[in-house]
């Protein structure tokens, strides 16, 4: 039995969000041991329980207040919301923040030998999908009628099996479509992972834990997006060098004991530092340039 006093977080047991969700929680300092066959894991150092379930079960667990938080793809969440609204419900939840992983798109794909002249080609066609409400929402806005073929997996085989004329499925790289003789023709929805919270007030202890977790998640994401830069730079070129570093804060500048014409610069850059940028820094006289990953950040 899960104790009500413990914060309950639902995440995907296996699939495209599972590994990165687990890594995010671990980087936030939550010590958990996940066993392959167990659906429930307990944090060792915080009053947190992790429920590992199918991704399409997570929105319902949050909306029905079975868990407090959920890490879920926006596409799965939106499909559940549309499903419940179609049934006359008014689902409520709180979006805590968008996360920096789980990027994908929901797209319509056709067999490679079929012509595509825009969405009107789908009029009265049979489309296989695991997201019937998102597909209907998109095509209804365009005034296009279609027949839905609901599949919960292996959607890409539907045209070859004679089940459908087209498919609407998640796409990351397009390799699966290509392997099944399909081509992507229309993006209908773009998605990332989100952290959501159930509707209603949490207990004071749970809310304090969520607040702490949000600060840590912010620090983890900022650290992943940032680099720590150190270099020796000529004093007369400081402004030029700083202008080459997009997203960089004003640097810490320290004198270099062995050379009064150079200073030591330390700074955090919130954007990717490419080789070309480092070469341009060197051309301006910078030396001993180091670009380091950041483990944690807190502002």
From Swiss-Prot:
Keyword Amino-acid biosynthesis annotated: yes
Pathway(s) it belongs to: Amino-acid biosynthesis; L-histidine biosynthesis; L-histidine from 5-phospho-alpha-D-ribose 1-diphosphate: step 1/9
Main location, first listed in the record: cytoplasm
Record EC number: 2.4.2.17
GO molecular function terms listed in the Swiss-Prot or TrEMBL record: ATP binding; ATP phosphoribosyltransferase activity; magnesium ion binding
GO biological process, one term: L-histidine biosynthetic process
Regulation (activators, inhibitors): Feedback inhibited by histidine.
InterPro entries found in the cross-reference section: ATP-PRT_HisG_long, ATP_PRibTrfase_cat, ATP_PRibTrfase_CS, ATP_PRibTrfase_HisG, HisG_C, N-reg_PII-like_a/b, N-reg_PII/ATP_PRibTrfase_C
Catalysed reaction, written as an equation: 1-(5-phospho-beta-D-ribosyl)-ATP + diphosphate = 5-phospho-alpha-D-ribose 1-diphosphate + ATP
Keyword annotations of the record: Amino-acid biosynthesis, ATP-binding, Cytoplasm, Glycosyltransferase, Histidine biosynthesis, Magnesium, Metal-binding, Nucleotide-binding, Transferase
GO cellular component: cytoplasm
Matching Gene3D superfamilies: 3.30.70.120, Periplasmic binding protein-like II
Function: Catalyzes the condensation of ATP and 5-phosphoribose 1-diphosphate to form N'-(5'-phosphoribosyl)-ATP (PR-ATP). Has a crucial role in the pathway because the rate of histidine biosynthesis seems to be controlled primarily by regulation of HisG enzymatic activity.
HAMAP family, sorted: HisG_Long (MF_00079)
NCBIfam families the record matches: hisG, HisG_C-term
UniProt record similarity statement: Belongs to the ATP phosphoribosyltransferase family. Long subfamily.
Record protein name field: ATP phosphoribosyltransferase
């Amino acid at each position: 039995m899960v104790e009500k006093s413990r914060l309950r977080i639902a995440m995907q047991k296996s699939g495209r969000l599972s590994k990165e969700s687990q890594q995010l929680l671990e980087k936030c300092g939550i010590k958990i041991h996940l066993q392959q066959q167990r659906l429930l894991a307990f944090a060792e150092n915080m009053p947190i329980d992790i429920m590992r379930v199918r991704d399409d079960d997570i929105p319902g667990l949050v909306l029905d207040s079975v868990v407090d938080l959920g890490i879920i793809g926006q596409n799965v969440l939106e499909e559940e919301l549309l499903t419940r609204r179609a049934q006359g419900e008014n689902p409520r939840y709180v979006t805590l923040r968008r996360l920096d992983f789980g990027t994908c798109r929901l797209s319509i794909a056709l067999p490679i030998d079929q012509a595509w002249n825009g969405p009107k080609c789908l009029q009265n066609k049979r489309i296989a999908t695991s997201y019937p409400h998102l597909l209907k929402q998109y095509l209804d806005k365009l005034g296009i009628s279609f027949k839905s073929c609901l599949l919960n997996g292996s959607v890409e085989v539907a045209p070859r099996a004679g089940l459908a004329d087209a498919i609407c499925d998640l796409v990351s790289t397009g390799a699966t479509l290509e392997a099944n003789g399909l081509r992507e023709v229309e993006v209908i929805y773009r998605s990332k992972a989100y952290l959501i919270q159930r509707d209603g007030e949490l207990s004071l202890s749970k809310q304090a834990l969520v607040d702490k977790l949000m600060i840590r998640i912010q620090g983890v994401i900022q650290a992943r997006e940032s680099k720590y830069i150190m270099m020796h730079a000529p004093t007369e070129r400081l402004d030029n060098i700083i202008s080459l570093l997009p997203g960089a804060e004003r640097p810490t500048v320290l004198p270099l004991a062995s050379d009064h014409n150079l200073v030591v610069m330390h700074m955090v850059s919130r954007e990717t530092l490419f080789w070309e940028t480092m070469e341009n820094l060197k051309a301006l006289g910078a030396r001993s340039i180091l670009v380091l990953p950041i483990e944690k950040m807190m502002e």
